[in-house]
């Protein structure tokens, strides 16, 4: 009988490390509207393979030159971009600081790249990618288009797609007064993601046993035409090789 490797981030998510990102912005257009706050929440894996929320990092961000800021958006998130006591830093500095932590976490978890976890993740990923392009950051540790969306997961698991409702449906706490802060929303998103993953733990373990019985599986080429850095998945679920997470080629989703 094939021995199945212990559950790690690398085996649980096929070599990718989920990192929760939430942004607060001056609108809905990632190309024209300001990025005002960004928070990252790192996850921890317990000895039994279940997930828990870990460290939170949050930065206030200075609007880029010429950035649009809609009054309606500022009313929702309660941010005064020009408040003299707001400890805001440049987009590039905020990204570099978070990315440094993400790269360290990727190496520690023996993963190949990070995948953004977000509630309506396309929104956060679009703003992240737009800020990366503006700041000309060369080493983005996040996959450019793959993500884990907790709006989708909440709908599947609990029948709720709104963050507050999905959080409450999952049996977690919600503080309306703290909502629309990047750090608070990212932490609730992390809790929701961990809860759903943990509830699907039995399904995941059954799938690992099923795949292990099939023998080694070849990984299909990525949409970019490049070979995936994991190349082949062993019967244990362990990637047979890994690559530098800062490499420019994106692995398949």
Where are these regions (language model features)?
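Acidic, Mg2+-coordinating catalytic module of metal-dependent nucleases/exonucleases
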Residues: 115-122, 126-132, 161-220, 252
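Acidic active-site catalytic centers that drive phospho-/nucleotidyl reactions
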Residues: 22-24, 124, 149, 185
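Active-site-proximal helix-loop-helix substrate-binding element of RNase H-like nuclease domains
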Residues: 61-77, 81-84, 150-190
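Amphipathic alpha-helical interface surfaces
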Residues: 69, 94-98, 124-131, 146-149, ...
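Conserved non-catalytic scaffold segment of RNase H-like nuclease domains
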Residues: 2-122
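Histidine/lysine/aspartate-rich catalytic loop segments that bind and position anionic ligands
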Residues: 132-137, 141-156
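Long, low-complexity, intrinsically disordered segments
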Residues: 223-253
């Amino acid at each position: 009988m094939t021995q199945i490797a212990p559950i790690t981030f690398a085996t649980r998510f096929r070599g990718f490390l989920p990192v929760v990102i939430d942004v607060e912005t001056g609108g809905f257009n990632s190309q024209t509207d300001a990025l005002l706050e960004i928070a990252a929440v790192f996850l921890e894996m317990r000895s039994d393979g279940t997930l828990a929320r870990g460290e939170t990092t949050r930065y206030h961000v200075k609007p880029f030159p010429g950035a649009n800021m809609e009054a309606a958006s500022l009313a929702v998130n309660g941010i005064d971009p020009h408040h003299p006591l707001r400890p805001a830093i440049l987009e590039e500095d905020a990204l570099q600081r978070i990315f440094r932590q993400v790269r360290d976490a990727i190496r520690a978890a023996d993963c190949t790249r990070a995948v953004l976890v977000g509630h309506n993740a396309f929104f956060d990923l679009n703003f992240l990618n737009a800020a990366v392009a503006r700041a000309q950051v060369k080493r983005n540790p996040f996959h450019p288009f793959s993500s884990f969306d907790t709006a989708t997961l909440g709908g599947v698991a609990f029948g709720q797609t709104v963050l507050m409702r999905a959080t409450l449906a999952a049996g977690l706490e919600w503080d309306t007064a703290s909502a629309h802060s990047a750090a608070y929303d990212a932490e609730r998103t992390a809790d929701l993601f961990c809860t759903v993953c943990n509830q699907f733990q039995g399904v995941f373990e059954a799938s690992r046993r099923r795949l292990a019985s099939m023998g080694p599986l070849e990984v299909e080429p990525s949409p970019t035409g490049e070979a995936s850095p994991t190349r082949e998945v062993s019967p244990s679920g362990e990637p047979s090789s890994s690559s530098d997470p800062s490499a420019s080629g994106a692995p398949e989703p």
